[in-house]
């Protein structure tokens, strides 16, 4: 299982509440349809004023090739472009991980 973890910070023109609403209601449903995506979670800080980012997204794919194909697809490009409308993508941190489940 390959996981892409991304930290996101809201753009300067959005409040945390606007960012969270847009993410949940607009962006997440779009990204949820990425080809090959098996699991998708997003977490928001309980105290956004003291957090260093506004969301942590985790997208799970069967392997790295499937993940790369998903983001190379037309929908993948649309998801990336949409993220740029509400988040500071230059500040986003991305890491690709191979996950081992210890407790489920």
Where are these regions (language model features)?
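Macromolecular interaction modules
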Residues: 1-104
């Amino acid at each position: 299982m390959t996981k892409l973890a991304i930290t996101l910070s809201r753009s300067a023109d959005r409040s945390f509440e606007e960012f969270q609403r847009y993410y949940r209601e607009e962006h997440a449903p779009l990204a949820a349809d990425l080809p090959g995506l098996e699991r998708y979670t997003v977490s928001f800080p309980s105290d956004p004023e003291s957090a260093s980012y506004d969301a942590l997204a985790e997208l799970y794919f069967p392997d790295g090739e499937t993940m790369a194909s998903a983001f190379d697809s037309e929908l993948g490009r649309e998801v990336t472009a949409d993220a740029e409308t509400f988040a500071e993508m230059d500040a986003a941190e991305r890491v690709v991980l191979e996950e081992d489940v210890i407790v489920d």
